[in-house]
Every structure is written in C-alpha cells, then in structure tokens.
UniProtKB/Swiss-Prot annotation:
Belongs to the enolase family. The gene is eno. SMART domains: Enolase_C, Enolase_N. This is Enolase. (2R)-2-phosphoglycerate binds at Q165, K339, R368, S369, K390.
Length: 430
C-alpha cells in the first residue's frame, strides 16, 4: 500500500552552512522516501516563499524551525492515510492547505520537501529508481541531459569584480553523458592550470566554479577558451559556452551597471552588448540576459538573437506556469530554467516542463547555489522532456552528487542510454 503512515521533517545544513528543510515520508508498507530542499542566493521576486524564522539570535535569522513545525504538525496530520501515489492530488492538497498564492503561510520549503519525499517513497514501494517512476507520471522518453557546467563564478555567487554570475561549458559534441562529464572535468582542471599561469586565484565560489578577480567580464570568456584548447577540445565544435548573466542583480533605475566593464547601459545598449558577444564567441545559451521586470528588453533580445541562441528565463519565469504562459504568449525568451523550489511542488515543476515542450521552448533542470547531497533533480532531468541540467562545477560534493547520479542512471539504462547532445536545444530547431 502507498498510503502515508508518517511524515517527519528536520532542520539540516545546506552547502553554504545555512539551515534548510529535510522531509521524510514513510508508507504503510514500510517504504521510505527522503528529500532535502535547496536554497538560492540570487532569487526572483516572484518565487514561492522560502519560510525562514527571522530569529537573529539563531542561525542569523535563517533557521527553518517554523517550516519544520508546519510539516510535523499541520501537513503530517492532513496527509496521514493519503495515497502518496496520487502525486497530483497530494500536491493539490498541500497547495490548498497553504492557501496562499506564493505558499507563504506554510512555506514552499515545507511543501516541496514533502512533495519530493512522497515521490521517493512511492518509487521505493514500487522497487523502481526515482527516474523510472517519474517517467511513468510524465510519459516521457528518458534521456541523459547535456550538463551546463559552471566553471567560473561571479555576481552573487562569488566575491569578485565579475558582473555575470556564471560562465559555463556545454560538451555537446560528446557521444555520451559520461564522455561529456569527462570533457567538462578535463576543461575544469585545465582552467585551474591556466588561472595559475596568469597569477589568478583558484579559489572557488558557491557552485564550485573558480572565482578569480578578472579585470572584465570578457576576460573570463577568453580564459575559458584558452582552457578548452589546452584540454584538447575545440570550442564551437566539441564545446559550446553558456552564460547566466543574472542581470536583475545589477539592474538599477532602468540601467544595467557593469562594474567590470565600467559601463552603465540602457536595455537597447545591453542587448547590443550581448549580441556582440554572440557574434564573437561560441555562445549557445544566455540565461537572464535582461532583468526580470524588463519585458521590453527581453522582447528586443529575443528578436535580436533568439533564432541563434537559447535565451533562458530564470528570474523572468520562476518556474511558475502562470508567469511562463505570459512569456510563451508574448514570444519572450525561448527556454525556461526549472528550479523545484521556485514553485514548491513536484506537480507544478512537471507542469512547467510539459508547457515548455508543448511550446517548443527548451527546459533546463537546475540546482540552487545553496544545495545538499540530494540528487532528485538528476532523476527529474532524465524522466522529463528537459534536455539540459545545471548543477554547478566539477568540484564540491553537493554538485558532483548530481553528476554521479546521472552516471548511475546512464549505466542502468545500458544500451538504451541516449545523450541529448546537439539535439538539446529544441527551441533553435523551429
């Protein structure tokens, strides 16, 4: 039986040393599922609410005891004897129980922990790996996603003068996920050598990428190209580049303030700036190229480079199907970043991915800068029509855990394992 016998939550630590919530669901047959909730550093203003205690005398106000109490009290009582195999019904019950648009009463962290743990428990009850169980919900063909490997950190993820938050390599020319992971790892180590040779720091940021104090943003791109060549790969063929501009972080009074470039640009000027980069470098993906409230700028960027480059809405869409529909209807961007904690339940996460697929938008399953050893997002990426995954660099166990899970899944699939590769960019095929 997949009816819920017990729900239990606790406060644990994430990769930045901040508290987060972990939930466990036990079923009547003794099957058990556990999930930990991630947390972001740069967050969209329309994200579901992560409930924090606010008590400055404890964990500097970042404790999650209230969210834990909500799980162990109201949620556990309401869902006792509920059939966890009814994922949609369970998530609807959680949403109704919270009763707010942004999940601010019980906390999106409380709802998400239970939602994901329930899926783990049902998979265990059916003696299936999570990705296989989820694929029965999504009715999707399974595939190994292209990893978007964040090897240089800037912005809110590092203490340096780099404005852009992430510089990524995408090994699209590899024949398998395991080969793609090897390529990324070799480039990562090559980059460390290049940075040392330039007398730059090899300290890493929140997501495991290096965080050197470059003189400008473009210097980061040039250094990555050098590292790709040194590792024996060809940029533009084997390896493409991706950016997370996270432009909401430096958007102020209608201008984009680039400290690294000593420039203050209008939306039109910043679109020109990004378009010039696309013309000069093998860039295939730009995330949050414009600020989340600059819809006119987004429209302009989409018209300018949207047929050549994947334009990913993160802060723009916050994994919210209602907001995402506005983007689809207006032809804004051509891809969506999927973060489970931005929306707060598994069902809504899967709904956003399905919406993207129907609209020929690409979807990228993503971690957060505050992560744990939880690997759920790896299984979600395989079991859905998402063709890419963002889960950080090639160091820090909270990032590598997801890559290792994907290696396990690839091995389990055997000859049936398919790597998305160049086919990952579905929005550029229309």
């Amino acid at each position: 039986m997949t009816t819920i016998a017990k729900i239990l939550a606790r406060e644990i630590l994430d990769s930045r040393g901040n508290p987060t919530l972990e939930a466990e669901v036990t079923l009547d047959d003794g099957s058990f599922g556990r999930a930990a909730v991630p947390s972001g550093a740069s967050t969209g203003t329309k994200e579901a609410v992560e409930l924090r205690d606010g008590d400055k005398t404890r964990y500097l106000g970042k404790g999650v005891r209230h969210a834990v109490d909500n799980v162990n009290g109201t949620i556990a009582e309401t869902l006792k004897n509920f059939d966890a195999a009814d994922q949609q019904g369970l998530d609807r019950r959680l949403i109704d129980l919270d009763g707010t648009e942004n999940k601010g009463r019980l906390g999106a962290n409380a709802l998400l922990g239970v939602s994901l743990a329930a899926a783990h428990a049902v998979a265990a009850s059916r003696k299936q790996p999570l990705w296989q169980y989820l694929s029965t919900i999504t009715e999707s063909d399974v595939a190994l996603p292209v990893p978007m490997m964040n090897i240089i950190n800037g912005g809110a993820h590092a203490d340096n003068n780099v404005d852009f938050q992430e510089f990524m390599v995408l090994p699209v020319g590899c024949s398998s996920f395991s080969e793609a992971l090897r390529a990324g790892t070799e480039i990562f180590h090559s980059l460390k050598s290049v940075l040392k040779g330039h007398g730059l720091s090899t300290a890493v940021g929140d997501e495991g990428g290096f965080a050197p104090d470059f003189r400008s943003n473009v210097e980061a791109l040039d250094t990555i190209l050098e590292a790709i060549g040194k590792a024996g790969y060809t940029a533009g063929e084997d390896i493409l580049l991706g950016l997370d501009v996270a432009s909401s972080e430096f958007y102020d009074n209608g201008k984009y303030n680039l400290v690294g470039e000593n420039k203050r640009l209008t939306s039109e000027q910043f679109v020109d700036f990004l378009a010039d980069w696309v013309a000069q470098y093998p860039i295939i993906s730009i995330e949050d190229g414009l600020a989340e409230d600059d819809w006119a700028g987004w429209k302009l960027l989409t018209e300018r480079v949207g047929k050549k480059v994947q334009l990913v809405g993160d802060d723009l869409f916050v994994t919210n199907p209602k907001i995402f529909k506005q983007g689809i209807d207006s032809g804004t961007a051509n891809a969506i970043l999927i973060k489970v904690n931005q929306i707060g339940t598994l069902t809504e996460t899967l709904e956003a991915i399905a919406m993207a697929h129907a609209a020929h938008y690409a979807s990228i399953v993503s971690h957060r800068s505050g992560e744990t050893e939880d690997t759920t997002i790896a299984d979600i990426a395989v079991a859905t029509t998402a063709t890419q995954i963002k889960t950080g660099s090639l160091c820090r166990s909270d990032r590598v855990a997801k890559y290792n899970q994907l290696l396990r899944i690839e091995q389990a699939l055997g000859s049936g394992a398919r790597y998305a590769g160049r086919d990952a960019f579905v929005s550029l095929k229309r």
